[in-house]
Protein backbone atom coordinates (compact mmCIF):
# COMPACT_ATOMS: atom_id res chain seq x y z
CA UNK A 1 0.00 0.00 0.00
CA UNK A 2 1.49 3.28 -1.08
CA UNK A 3 1.90 5.93 1.61
CA UNK A 4 -0.13 9.04 0.88
CA UNK A 5 -2.28 11.63 2.61
CA UNK A 6 -6.01 11.73 1.91
CA UNK A 7 -7.90 14.94 2.36
CA UNK A 8 -11.54 14.71 3.18
CA UNK A 9 -13.60 17.74 2.91
CA UNK A 10 -17.28 18.13 3.65
CA UNK A 11 -19.53 21.11 3.35
CA UNK A 12 -22.36 21.93 5.61
CA UNK A 13 -25.88 21.30 4.36
CA UNK A 14 -28.13 24.25 3.71
CA UNK A 15 -29.81 25.65 6.73
CA UNK A 16 -33.25 24.80 5.47
CA UNK A 17 -32.37 21.27 4.29
CA UNK A 18 -33.81 18.07 5.70
CA UNK A 19 -31.82 15.99 8.09
CA UNK A 20 -32.15 13.03 5.67
CA UNK A 21 -30.41 15.00 2.93
CA UNK A 22 -27.72 15.93 5.41
CA UNK A 23 -27.16 12.30 6.29
CA UNK A 24 -27.04 11.36 2.58
CA UNK A 25 -24.54 14.13 2.00
CA UNK A 26 -22.36 12.93 4.78
CA UNK A 27 -22.56 9.37 3.52
CA UNK A 28 -21.70 10.47 -0.02
CA UNK A 29 -18.80 12.51 1.26
CA UNK A 30 -17.58 9.54 3.18
CA UNK A 31 -17.94 7.07 0.28
CA UNK A 32 -16.44 9.48 -2.31
CA UNK A 33 -17.42 10.47 -5.85
CA UNK A 34 -16.26 9.45 -9.28
CA UNK A 35 -13.30 11.82 -9.09
CA UNK A 36 -12.09 10.49 -5.79
CA UNK A 37 -8.72 8.93 -6.42
CA UNK A 38 -8.54 7.11 -3.16
CA UNK A 39 -11.64 5.06 -3.94
CA UNK A 40 -12.89 2.39 -1.70
CA UNK A 41 -9.57 2.05 0.05
CA UNK A 42 -10.07 5.26 1.90
CA UNK A 43 -13.67 4.45 2.56
CA UNK A 44 -12.50 1.16 3.91
CA UNK A 45 -10.80 2.62 6.98
CA UNK A 46 -13.43 5.26 7.49
CA UNK A 47 -15.16 3.34 10.24
CA UNK A 48 -11.91 3.20 12.14
CA UNK A 49 -11.67 6.98 12.00
CA UNK A 50 -15.16 7.78 13.03
CA UNK A 51 -13.54 9.67 15.82
CA UNK A 52 -12.77 12.38 13.33
CA UNK A 53 -16.40 13.32 13.49
CA UNK A 54 -15.83 14.61 16.99
CA UNK A 55 -16.04 18.35 17.49
CA UNK A 56 -13.38 20.05 15.38
CA UNK A 57 -11.12 22.95 16.11
CA UNK A 58 -12.67 26.07 17.60
CA UNK A 59 -14.01 28.89 15.49
CA UNK A 60 -12.07 31.96 14.63
CA UNK A 61 -14.02 33.79 17.31
CA UNK A 62 -12.89 31.33 19.98
CA UNK A 63 -9.23 31.43 18.92
CA UNK A 64 -9.13 35.11 18.27
CA UNK A 65 -8.38 34.80 14.54
CA UNK A 66 -10.38 36.18 11.64
CA UNK A 67 -12.71 33.79 9.78
CA UNK A 68 -11.14 32.59 6.57
CA UNK A 69 -13.29 32.66 3.43
CA UNK A 70 -13.96 29.48 1.57
CA UNK A 71 -12.16 28.79 -1.68
CA UNK A 72 -13.61 29.84 -5.00
CA UNK A 73 -14.45 26.32 -5.95
CA UNK A 74 -16.67 25.89 -2.93
CA UNK A 75 -19.62 27.91 -4.20
CA UNK A 76 -23.19 27.02 -3.27
CA UNK A 77 -24.04 25.55 0.02
CA UNK A 78 -25.23 22.32 -1.41
CA UNK A 79 -22.35 19.92 -1.43
CA UNK A 80 -18.64 19.63 -0.89
CA UNK A 81 -16.38 16.84 -2.04
CA UNK A 82 -12.80 15.78 -2.18
CA UNK A 83 -10.41 18.74 -2.31
CA UNK A 84 -7.11 18.39 -4.12
CA UNK A 85 -4.90 21.32 -3.13
CA UNK A 86 -2.63 20.90 -6.16
CA UNK A 87 -3.58 24.13 -7.84
CA UNK A 88 -4.54 25.99 -4.72
CA UNK A 89 -3.47 29.53 -4.35
CA UNK A 90 -2.08 30.54 -0.93
CA UNK A 91 -3.40 33.58 0.78
CA UNK A 92 -6.44 32.43 2.73
CA UNK A 93 -6.41 31.82 6.47
CA UNK A 94 -7.90 29.04 8.51
CA UNK A 95 -7.91 28.11 12.17
CA UNK A 96 -5.72 25.20 13.19
CA UNK A 97 -4.30 23.74 16.39
CA UNK A 98 -1.96 26.59 17.12
CA UNK A 99 -3.61 29.37 15.11
CA UNK A 100 -4.48 30.46 11.60
CA UNK A 101 -2.71 28.57 8.80
CA UNK A 102 -3.01 29.57 5.09
CA UNK A 103 -5.38 27.20 3.32
CA UNK A 104 -4.65 26.63 -0.36
CA UNK A 105 -7.65 27.27 -2.64
CA UNK A 106 -8.11 25.49 -5.95
CA UNK A 107 -8.19 27.48 -9.19
CA UNK A 108 -11.58 28.36 -10.72
CA UNK A 109 -11.26 25.75 -13.50
CA UNK A 110 -10.98 22.79 -11.16
CA UNK A 111 -13.88 20.47 -10.55
CA UNK A 112 -14.86 19.56 -7.02
CA UNK A 113 -16.77 16.43 -6.31
CA UNK A 114 -19.82 17.08 -4.25
CA UNK A 115 -23.03 15.19 -3.93
CA UNK A 116 -23.56 13.49 -7.28
CA UNK A 117 -20.32 14.92 -8.60
CA UNK A 118 -21.78 18.30 -9.67
CA UNK A 119 -19.25 20.78 -10.90
CA UNK A 120 -18.98 24.06 -9.08
CA UNK A 121 -18.88 27.30 -11.05
CA UNK A 122 -15.64 29.17 -10.98
CA UNK A 123 -17.20 32.49 -10.36
CA UNK A 124 -19.34 31.39 -7.48
CA UNK A 125 -18.58 32.99 -4.19
CA UNK A 126 -17.26 31.11 -1.21
CA UNK A 127 -19.44 30.42 1.76
CA UNK A 128 -18.74 32.64 4.78
CA UNK A 129 -18.16 29.59 7.03
CA UNK A 130 -14.56 29.05 8.01
CA UNK A 131 -12.81 25.93 6.87
CA UNK A 132 -10.78 23.98 9.43
CA UNK A 133 -8.35 21.18 8.96
CA UNK A 134 -6.79 18.73 11.36
CA UNK A 135 -3.70 16.63 10.87
CA UNK A 136 -3.46 13.16 12.34
CA UNK A 137 0.10 11.95 12.91
CA UNK A 138 -0.59 8.50 11.47
CA UNK A 139 1.91 6.39 9.60
CA UNK A 140 0.07 6.51 6.25
CA UNK A 141 0.40 10.26 6.06
CA UNK A 142 -1.38 13.30 7.44
CA UNK A 143 -5.15 13.16 6.89
CA UNK A 144 -6.74 16.56 6.77
CA UNK A 145 -10.46 16.73 7.40
CA UNK A 146 -12.52 19.90 7.15
CA UNK A 147 -15.50 20.18 9.39
CA UNK A 148 -18.86 20.23 7.65
CA UNK A 149 -21.05 21.08 10.58
CA UNK A 150 -21.57 24.15 12.69
CA UNK A 151 -18.43 25.55 14.22
CA UNK A 152 -18.17 23.48 17.38
CA UNK A 153 -14.96 22.91 19.31
CA UNK A 154 -13.06 19.86 18.20
CA UNK A 155 -11.05 17.62 20.40
CA UNK A 156 -8.13 17.80 18.04
CA UNK A 157 -7.42 21.42 19.03
CA UNK A 158 -4.99 20.53 21.79
CA UNK A 159 -1.65 20.94 20.14
CA UNK A 160 0.27 23.39 18.02
CA UNK A 161 -0.45 24.58 14.50
CA UNK A 162 -0.71 21.98 11.74
CA UNK A 163 -0.05 22.92 8.15
CA UNK A 164 -2.19 21.62 5.25
CA UNK A 165 -1.01 18.27 4.04
CA UNK A 166 -0.58 17.61 0.36
CA UNK A 167 -2.29 14.61 -1.16
CA UNK A 168 -0.58 11.86 -2.99
CA UNK A 169 -2.32 12.80 -6.27
CA UNK A 170 -0.80 16.29 -6.27
CA UNK A 171 2.77 16.22 -5.09
CA UNK A 172 3.35 19.74 -6.36
CA UNK A 173 1.52 21.39 -3.46
CA UNK A 174 3.18 23.64 -0.92
CA UNK A 175 5.32 21.90 1.72
CA UNK A 176 3.69 21.39 5.13
CA UNK A 177 4.70 23.72 7.98
CA UNK A 178 6.71 22.18 10.85
CA UNK A 179 4.71 21.07 13.88
CA UNK A 180 5.74 22.28 17.32
CA UNK A 181 4.44 19.05 18.77
CA UNK A 182 5.64 15.54 18.04
CA UNK A 183 6.76 15.27 14.38
CA UNK A 184 4.94 12.89 12.02
CA UNK A 185 6.39 9.46 11.60
CA UNK A 186 8.14 8.28 8.46
CA UNK A 187 5.84 7.33 5.54
CA UNK A 188 7.39 3.88 5.25
CA UNK A 189 5.24 2.34 7.97
CA UNK A 190 2.63 -0.29 7.15
CA UNK A 191 -1.08 -0.20 7.71
CA UNK A 192 -0.79 -2.49 10.71
CA UNK A 193 0.34 0.37 12.91
CA UNK A 194 -3.00 2.21 12.83
CA UNK A 195 -3.85 1.03 16.33
CA UNK A 196 -0.56 2.45 17.60
CA UNK A 197 -1.33 5.74 15.88
CA UNK A 198 -4.71 5.88 17.62
CA UNK A 199 -2.99 5.34 20.98
CA UNK A 200 -0.52 8.11 20.26
CA UNK A 201 -3.36 10.39 19.26
CA UNK A 202 -5.03 9.67 22.62
CA UNK A 203 -1.77 10.44 24.42
CA UNK A 204 -1.51 13.71 22.50
CA UNK A 205 -5.04 14.58 23.52
CA UNK A 206 -4.27 13.75 27.16
CA UNK A 207 -0.89 15.54 27.25
CA UNK A 208 -0.77 19.00 28.88
CA UNK A 209 0.54 20.54 25.67
CA UNK A 210 -2.23 19.01 23.58
CA UNK A 211 -5.12 20.23 25.71
CA UNK A 212 -7.51 22.56 23.95
CA UNK A 213 -9.35 25.66 25.02
CA UNK A 214 -8.63 27.07 28.45
CA UNK A 215 -6.90 23.91 29.66
CA UNK A 216 -4.04 24.37 27.14
CA UNK A 217 -3.49 27.97 28.17
CA UNK A 218 -3.51 27.04 31.85
CA UNK A 219 -1.03 24.20 31.27
CA UNK A 220 1.26 26.53 29.34
CA UNK A 221 1.02 29.10 32.12
CA UNK A 222 1.84 26.40 34.67
CA UNK A 223 4.88 25.34 32.65
CA UNK A 224 6.02 28.95 32.38
CA UNK A 225 5.55 29.38 36.13
CA UNK A 226 7.66 26.30 36.81
CA UNK A 227 10.39 27.58 34.49
CA UNK A 228 10.33 30.97 36.22
CA UNK A 229 10.52 29.32 39.65
CA UNK A 230 13.48 27.23 38.53
CA UNK A 231 15.21 30.35 37.23
CA UNK A 232 14.54 32.13 40.52
CA UNK A 233 15.97 29.20 42.48
CA UNK A 234 19.06 29.27 40.29
CA UNK A 235 19.46 33.01 40.84
CA UNK A 236 19.12 32.59 44.63
CA UNK A 237 21.69 29.79 44.65
CA UNK A 238 24.14 31.91 42.68
CA UNK A 239 23.54 34.83 45.04
CA UNK A 240 24.27 32.61 48.05
CA UNK A 241 27.49 31.41 46.43
CA UNK A 242 28.51 34.99 45.70
CA UNK A 243 27.81 35.99 49.31
CA UNK A 244 29.88 33.07 50.60
CA UNK A 245 32.76 34.04 48.32
CA UNK A 246 32.54 37.65 49.47
CA UNK A 247 32.67 36.53 53.11
CA UNK A 248 35.75 34.42 52.43
CA UNK A 249 37.40 37.35 50.66
CA UNK A 250 36.64 39.65 53.61
CA UNK A 251 38.03 37.13 56.11
CA UNK A 252 41.21 36.72 54.08
CA UNK A 253 41.57 40.49 53.86
CA UNK A 254 41.18 40.84 57.63
CA UNK A 255 43.77 38.11 58.25
CA UNK A 256 46.13 39.82 55.84
CA UNK A 257 45.67 43.14 57.66
CA UNK A 258 46.35 41.53 61.04
CA UNK A 259 49.50 39.86 59.74
CA UNK A 260 50.73 43.12 58.27
CA UNK A 261 50.10 44.85 61.60
CA UNK A 262 52.07 42.14 63.42
CA UNK A 263 54.95 42.48 60.99
CA UNK A 264 55.00 46.24 61.54
CA UNK A 265 55.03 45.76 65.32
CA UNK A 266 57.90 43.31 65.09
CA UNK A 267 59.86 45.72 62.92
CA UNK A 268 59.29 48.52 65.42
CA UNK A 269 60.44 46.30 68.28
CA UNK A 270 63.57 45.32 66.40
CA UNK A 271 64.34 48.97 65.73
CA UNK A 272 63.87 49.81 69.41
CA UNK A 273 66.14 46.93 70.46
CA UNK A 274 68.81 48.11 68.03
CA UNK A 275 68.57 51.65 69.40
CA UNK A 276 68.91 50.40 72.99
CA UNK A 277 71.97 48.34 72.09
CA UNK A 278 73.56 51.32 70.38
CA UNK A 279 72.87 53.52 73.41
CA UNK A 280 74.49 50.96 75.72
CA UNK A 281 77.54 50.80 73.52
CA UNK A 282 77.87 54.59 73.54
CA UNK A 283 77.53 54.63 77.33
CA UNK A 284 80.23 52.01 77.73
CA UNK A 285 82.57 53.86 75.40
CA UNK A 286 81.89 57.12 77.22
CA UNK A 287 82.47 55.42 80.58
CA UNK A 288 86.01 54.42 79.63
CA UNK A 289 87.09 57.97 78.83
CA UNK A 290 86.20 59.61 82.21
CA UNK A 291 87.72 56.66 84.06
CA UNK A 292 91.02 57.13 82.29
CA UNK A 293 90.93 60.88 82.92
CA UNK A 294 90.19 60.42 86.64
CA UNK A 295 92.91 57.80 86.95
CA UNK A 296 95.42 60.16 85.37
CA UNK A 297 94.36 63.00 87.68
CA UNK A 298 94.55 60.81 90.78
CA UNK A 299 97.97 59.47 89.83
CA UNK A 300 99.27 63.02 89.35
CA UNK A 301 97.92 64.10 92.74
CA UNK A 302 99.42 61.10 94.50
CA UNK A 303 102.75 61.70 92.81
CA UNK A 304 102.80 65.27 94.08
CA UNK A 305 101.90 64.13 97.60
CA UNK A 306 104.38 61.25 97.71
CA UNK A 307 107.36 63.08 96.26
CA UNK A 308 108.75 64.33 99.62
CA UNK A 309 108.24 60.90 101.22
CA UNK A 310 110.04 59.19 98.37
CA UNK A 311 112.92 61.63 98.68
CA UNK A 312 113.20 60.93 102.39
CA UNK A 313 113.21 57.18 101.90
CA UNK A 314 115.76 57.39 99.09
CA UNK A 315 118.05 59.43 101.33
CA UNK A 316 117.58 57.13 104.31
CA UNK A 317 118.30 53.92 102.43
CA UNK A 318 121.93 54.59 101.29
CA UNK A 319 122.90 56.34 104.58
CA UNK A 320 122.59 53.18 106.67
CA UNK A 321 124.08 49.96 105.28
CA UNK A 322 122.26 46.62 105.55
CA UNK A 323 123.98 43.86 107.46
CA UNK A 324 121.75 40.95 106.37
CA UNK A 325 120.73 39.36 103.04
CA UNK A 326 117.07 40.19 103.31
CA UNK A 327 117.89 43.84 103.76
CA UNK A 328 119.64 43.69 100.40
CA UNK A 329 116.44 42.49 98.77
CA UNK A 330 114.61 45.38 100.29
CA UNK A 331 117.25 47.75 98.92
CA UNK A 332 116.75 46.37 95.40
CA UNK A 333 113.01 47.06 95.55
CA UNK A 334 113.59 50.75 95.00
CA UNK A 335 113.66 50.54 91.18
CA UNK A 336 110.45 48.48 90.63
CA UNK A 337 108.64 50.70 93.10
CA UNK A 338 109.15 53.72 90.86
CA UNK A 339 107.98 51.80 87.78
CA UNK A 340 104.85 50.44 89.40
CA UNK A 341 103.88 53.81 90.78
CA UNK A 342 103.98 55.37 87.37
CA UNK A 343 101.90 52.77 85.52
CA UNK A 344 99.47 51.22 87.98
CA UNK A 345 96.16 52.95 88.79
CA UNK A 346 96.33 54.21 92.34
CA UNK A 347 92.60 54.32 93.06
CA UNK A 348 92.67 51.80 95.89
CA UNK A 349 95.95 52.81 97.48
CA UNK A 350 94.46 54.96 100.22
CA UNK A 351 91.87 52.46 101.54
CA UNK A 352 94.37 49.62 101.39
CA UNK A 353 97.00 51.65 103.16
CA UNK A 354 95.22 51.46 106.47
CA UNK A 355 94.52 47.73 106.07
CA UNK A 356 98.12 46.90 105.30
CA UNK A 357 99.46 49.01 108.15
CA UNK A 358 97.23 47.21 110.62
CA UNK A 359 97.93 43.74 109.20
CA UNK A 360 101.63 43.93 108.39
CA UNK A 361 102.94 43.44 111.94
CA UNK A 362 100.80 40.28 112.30
CA UNK A 363 101.05 38.55 108.93
CA UNK A 364 104.11 40.10 107.26
CA UNK A 365 106.62 37.36 106.40
CA UNK A 366 109.51 39.83 106.60
CA UNK A 367 110.91 39.81 110.10
CA UNK A 368 112.96 42.66 111.42
CA UNK A 369 116.58 41.76 111.95
CA UNK A 370 118.32 43.05 115.05
CA UNK A 371 120.82 44.84 112.87
CA UNK A 372 118.08 46.69 110.88
CA UNK A 373 117.09 50.20 111.78
CA UNK A 374 113.66 51.76 112.20
CA UNK A 375 113.84 53.69 108.95
CA UNK A 376 114.57 50.45 107.11
CA UNK A 377 111.43 48.76 108.43
CA UNK A 378 109.30 51.82 107.61
CA UNK A 379 110.60 51.83 104.06
CA UNK A 380 109.84 48.11 103.69
CA UNK A 381 106.31 48.57 104.94
CA UNK A 382 105.65 51.44 102.58
CA UNK A 383 107.03 49.48 99.66
CA UNK A 384 104.97 46.42 100.60
CA UNK A 385 101.83 48.52 101.01
CA UNK A 386 102.28 50.01 97.57
CA UNK A 387 102.92 46.64 95.96
CA UNK A 388 100.11 44.71 97.61
CA UNK A 389 97.15 46.59 96.04
CA UNK A 390 97.95 44.93 92.75
CA UNK A 391 96.99 41.53 94.10
CA UNK A 392 93.24 42.15 94.41
CA UNK A 393 93.38 44.28 91.28
CA UNK A 394 94.85 41.50 89.19
CA UNK A 395 93.13 38.52 90.80
CA UNK A 396 89.62 39.97 90.90
CA UNK A 397 88.97 41.56 87.54
CA UNK A 398 85.76 43.55 87.67
CA UNK A 399 84.17 45.51 84.85
CA UNK A 400 84.66 49.30 84.95
CA UNK A 401 81.00 49.97 85.70
CA UNK A 402 81.18 48.16 89.03
CA UNK A 403 84.33 49.95 90.17
CA UNK A 404 82.88 53.41 89.63
CA UNK A 405 81.46 53.85 93.18
CA UNK A 406 85.00 54.00 94.56
CA UNK A 407 86.27 56.75 92.28
CA UNK A 408 85.46 59.93 94.12
CA UNK A 409 85.87 59.17 97.83
CA UNK A 410 89.03 57.11 97.40
CA UNK A 411 91.31 59.90 98.58
CA UNK A 412 88.81 61.16 101.14
CA UNK A 413 89.72 60.53 104.80
CA UNK A 414 86.30 58.90 105.39
CA UNK A 415 87.54 55.76 103.63
CA UNK A 416 89.63 54.87 106.63
CA UNK A 417 86.61 54.95 108.87
CA UNK A 418 84.63 52.86 106.34
CA UNK A 419 87.36 50.23 106.22
CA UNK A 420 87.44 49.97 109.99
CA UNK A 421 83.66 49.65 110.11
CA UNK A 422 83.72 46.92 107.46
CA UNK A 423 86.16 44.94 109.58
CA UNK A 424 83.94 45.27 112.62
CA UNK A 425 80.81 43.89 110.88
CA UNK A 426 80.06 40.20 111.63
CA UNK A 427 79.15 39.45 108.00
CA UNK A 428 80.77 39.97 104.66
CA UNK A 429 80.15 43.35 103.09
CA UNK A 430 81.19 45.25 100.04
CA UNK A 431 80.93 48.76 98.63
CA UNK A 432 80.45 47.61 95.05
CA UNK A 433 77.02 47.18 93.52
CA UNK A 434 76.25 43.65 92.41
CA UNK A 435 73.28 41.97 90.79
CA UNK A 436 70.95 40.07 93.10
CA UNK A 437 68.43 37.83 91.34
CA UNK A 438 65.33 37.89 93.46
CA UNK A 439 62.60 35.69 91.94
CA UNK A 440 63.50 36.95 88.50
CA UNK A 441 64.60 35.12 85.35
CA UNK A 442 68.22 35.54 84.32
CA UNK A 443 68.92 38.38 81.92
CA UNK A 444 69.31 37.78 78.23
CA UNK A 445 72.82 36.71 77.19
CA UNK A 446 73.08 39.29 74.40
CA UNK A 447 74.65 42.14 76.45
CA UNK A 448 76.99 39.66 78.14
CA UNK A 449 78.30 38.51 74.80
CA UNK A 450 78.84 42.06 73.68
CA UNK A 451 80.73 43.10 76.82
CA UNK A 452 83.01 40.04 76.90
CA UNK A 453 85.72 41.42 74.56
CA UNK A 454 85.83 44.64 76.57
CA UNK A 455 86.48 42.64 79.72
CA UNK A 456 89.37 40.92 78.02
CA UNK A 457 90.80 44.31 77.08
CA UNK A 458 90.61 45.50 80.69
CA UNK A 459 92.25 42.29 81.89
CA UNK A 460 95.09 42.74 79.44
CA UNK A 461 95.45 46.40 80.40
CA UNK A 462 95.59 45.50 84.10
CA UNK A 463 98.08 42.73 83.53
CA UNK A 464 100.57 44.85 81.62
CA UNK A 465 101.85 46.93 84.56
CA UNK A 466 101.85 43.90 86.81
CA UNK A 467 104.10 42.05 84.38
CA UNK A 468 106.61 44.90 84.65
CA UNK A 469 106.56 44.66 88.45
CA UNK A 470 109.01 41.77 88.44
CA UNK A 471 109.57 39.44 91.35
CA UNK A 472 107.52 41.24 93.95
CA UNK A 473 104.12 41.06 92.14
CA UNK A 474 102.28 37.77 92.46
CA UNK A 475 99.67 37.29 89.73
CA UNK A 476 97.22 34.46 89.13
CA UNK A 477 97.83 34.25 85.39
CA UNK A 478 97.11 31.04 83.48
CA UNK A 479 100.20 29.53 81.95
CA UNK A 480 100.00 29.08 78.20
CA UNK A 481 102.24 26.37 76.89
CA UNK A 482 102.85 25.12 73.37
CA UNK A 483 102.44 21.36 73.06
CA UNK A 484 103.95 19.85 69.98
CA UNK A 485 101.65 17.13 68.63
CA UNK A 486 103.33 14.46 66.55
CA UNK A 487 101.49 13.09 63.52
CA UNK A 488 99.75 9.77 63.91
CA UNK A 489 101.43 6.72 62.54
CA UNK A 490 99.76 4.08 60.44
CA UNK A 491 97.93 1.75 62.79
CA UNK A 492 99.30 -1.75 62.96
CA UNK A 493 96.89 -4.63 63.35
CA UNK A 494 98.57 -5.51 66.63
CA UNK A 495 97.91 -2.00 68.01
CA UNK A 496 94.15 -2.19 67.45
CA UNK A 497 92.60 -2.80 70.84
CA UNK A 498 89.14 -4.01 69.90
CA UNK A 499 87.15 -5.16 66.94
CA UNK A 500 84.39 -2.73 65.94
CA UNK A 501 82.44 -4.83 63.45
CA UNK A 502 78.66 -4.77 63.59
CA UNK A 503 78.32 -8.41 64.57
CA UNK A 504 80.89 -8.13 67.36
CA UNK A 505 79.36 -4.89 68.58
CA UNK A 506 75.84 -6.35 68.66
CA UNK A 507 77.03 -9.45 70.53
CA UNK A 508 78.87 -7.32 73.05
CA UNK A 509 75.89 -5.04 73.70
CA UNK A 510 73.12 -7.64 73.55
CA UNK A 511 73.53 -8.54 77.21
CA UNK A 512 73.53 -4.91 78.27
CA UNK A 513 70.40 -4.22 76.24
CA UNK A 514 68.65 -7.16 77.88
CA UNK A 515 69.64 -5.91 81.32
CA UNK A 516 68.34 -2.47 80.50
CA UNK A 517 65.03 -3.90 79.32
CA UNK A 518 64.72 -5.91 82.54
CA UNK A 519 65.37 -2.82 84.62
CA UNK A 520 62.78 -0.96 82.63
CA UNK A 521 60.21 -3.69 83.26
CA UNK A 522 61.07 -3.68 86.93
CA UNK A 523 60.63 0.11 87.08
CA UNK A 524 57.27 -0.14 85.35
CA UNK A 525 56.14 -2.80 87.85
CA UNK A 526 57.26 -0.70 90.80
CA UNK A 527 55.44 2.34 89.41
CA UNK A 528 52.29 0.28 89.02
CA UNK A 529 52.58 -0.98 92.57
CA UNK A 530 53.02 2.57 93.87
CA UNK A 531 49.95 3.74 91.99
CA UNK A 532 47.91 0.84 93.36
CA UNK A 533 49.12 1.67 96.87
CA UNK A 534 48.17 5.32 96.42
CA UNK A 535 44.69 4.34 95.27
CA UNK A 536 44.25 2.09 98.30
CA UNK A 537 45.41 4.89 100.60
CA UNK A 538 42.97 7.30 99.02
CA UNK A 539 40.15 4.82 99.59
CA UNK A 540 41.17 4.37 103.21
CA UNK A 541 41.41 8.13 103.81
CA UNK A 542 38.02 8.65 102.22
CA UNK A 543 36.45 6.01 104.45
CA UNK A 544 38.04 7.33 107.64
CA UNK A 545 37.64 10.95 106.66
CA UNK A 546 41.30 11.73 107.27
CA UNK A 547 42.60 14.62 105.23
CA UNK A 548 45.99 13.93 103.75
CA UNK A 549 48.44 16.72 104.44
CA UNK A 550 49.79 18.35 101.32
CA UNK A 551 53.53 19.07 101.26
CA UNK A 552 54.35 22.73 101.56
CA UNK A 553 56.45 24.30 98.87
CA UNK A 554 59.25 26.20 100.55
CA UNK A 555 62.02 28.37 99.20
CA UNK A 556 65.40 29.57 100.36
CA UNK A 557 64.40 33.15 99.73
CA UNK A 558 62.68 34.66 102.78
CA UNK A 559 59.34 36.35 102.56
CA UNK A 560 59.20 40.13 103.04
CA UNK A 561 56.78 39.61 105.96
CA UNK A 562 59.43 37.68 107.91
CA UNK A 563 61.75 40.66 108.38
CA UNK A 564 63.58 40.47 111.69
CA UNK A 565 65.64 43.65 111.71
CA UNK A 566 66.60 46.67 109.64
CA UNK A 567 70.14 47.91 109.28
CA UNK A 568 71.18 51.01 107.38
CA UNK A 569 74.86 50.96 106.46
CA UNK A 570 76.94 52.35 103.61
CA UNK A 571 78.01 48.78 102.82
CA UNK A 572 76.18 46.10 100.91
CA UNK A 573 76.03 42.74 102.66
CA UNK A 574 77.04 39.74 100.59
CA UNK A 575 73.78 37.78 100.57
CA UNK A 576 73.21 34.17 99.60
CA UNK A 577 69.64 32.79 99.60
CA UNK A 578 68.40 35.83 101.48
CA UNK A 579 70.91 35.52 104.34
CA UNK A 580 74.15 37.50 104.80
CA UNK A 581 77.25 35.36 104.70
CA UNK A 582 79.17 35.26 108.00
CA UNK A 583 82.62 36.74 108.12
CA UNK A 584 85.25 34.11 108.81
CA UNK A 585 88.75 34.99 109.88
CA UNK A 586 91.49 33.61 107.63
CA UNK A 587 92.97 30.58 109.39
CA UNK A 588 94.13 27.10 108.61
CA UNK A 589 91.42 24.56 108.00
CA UNK A 590 91.53 21.69 110.49
CA UNK A 591 89.28 18.73 111.13
CA UNK A 592 88.86 17.21 114.57
CA UNK A 593 89.39 13.62 113.46
CA UNK A 594 92.71 14.55 111.90
CA UNK A 595 94.13 15.55 115.29
CA UNK A 596 96.86 13.31 116.69
CA UNK A 597 94.99 12.61 119.89
CA UNK A 598 91.82 11.67 118.07
CA UNK A 599 93.80 9.36 115.78
CA UNK A 600 95.28 7.57 118.76
CA UNK A 601 91.86 7.12 120.31
CA UNK A 602 90.44 5.62 117.13
CA UNK A 603 93.32 3.18 116.81
CA UNK A 604 92.96 2.03 120.39
CA UNK A 605 89.25 1.42 119.94
CA UNK A 606 89.90 -0.61 116.82
CA UNK A 607 92.45 -2.81 118.57
CA UNK A 608 90.21 -3.61 121.53
CA UNK A 609 87.21 -4.56 119.46
CA UNK A 610 87.13 -8.37 119.19
CA UNK A 611 86.78 -10.01 115.81
CA UNK A 612 83.49 -11.80 115.60
CA UNK A 613 82.87 -14.59 113.13
CA UNK A 614 79.61 -16.36 112.56
CA UNK A 615 79.91 -19.99 113.41
CA UNK A 616 77.48 -22.58 112.13
UniProtKB/Swiss-Prot annotation:
Organism per entry: Mus musculus (Mouse)
Family: Belongs to the msl-1 family.
Gene name of the encoded protein: Msl1
Name under which the protein is recorded: Male-specific lethal 1 homolog
Alphabetical list of SMART domains matching this protein: PEHE
Chain residue ranges for the region called Interaction with KAT8 HAT domain: 498-516
Effect seen on changing residue 505 to R: Abolishes interaction with KAT8
Chain positions found as Phosphoserine: 66, 127, 207, 364, 385, 395, 444, 452, 484
Biased composition regions of type Basic and acidic residues, renumbered to the chain: 378-394
Pfam families associated with the record: MSL1_dimer, PEHE
Amino acid sequence: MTMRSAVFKAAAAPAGGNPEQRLDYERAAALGGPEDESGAAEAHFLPRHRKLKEPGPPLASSQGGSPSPSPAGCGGGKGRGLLLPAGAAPGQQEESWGGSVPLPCPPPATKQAGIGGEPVAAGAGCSPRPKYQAVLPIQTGSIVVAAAKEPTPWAGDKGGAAPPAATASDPAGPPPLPLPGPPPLAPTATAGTLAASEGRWKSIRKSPLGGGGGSGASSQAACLKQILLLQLDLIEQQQQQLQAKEKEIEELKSERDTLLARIERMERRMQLVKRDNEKERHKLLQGYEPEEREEAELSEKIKLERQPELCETSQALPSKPFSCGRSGKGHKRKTPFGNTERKTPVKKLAPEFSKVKTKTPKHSPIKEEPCGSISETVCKRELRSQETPEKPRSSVDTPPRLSTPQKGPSTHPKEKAFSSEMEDLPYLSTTEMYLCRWHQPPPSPLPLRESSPKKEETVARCLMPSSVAGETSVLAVPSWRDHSVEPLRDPNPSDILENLDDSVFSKRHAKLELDEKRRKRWDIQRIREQRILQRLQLRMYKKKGIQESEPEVTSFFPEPDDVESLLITPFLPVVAFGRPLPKLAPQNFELPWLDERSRCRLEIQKKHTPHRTCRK
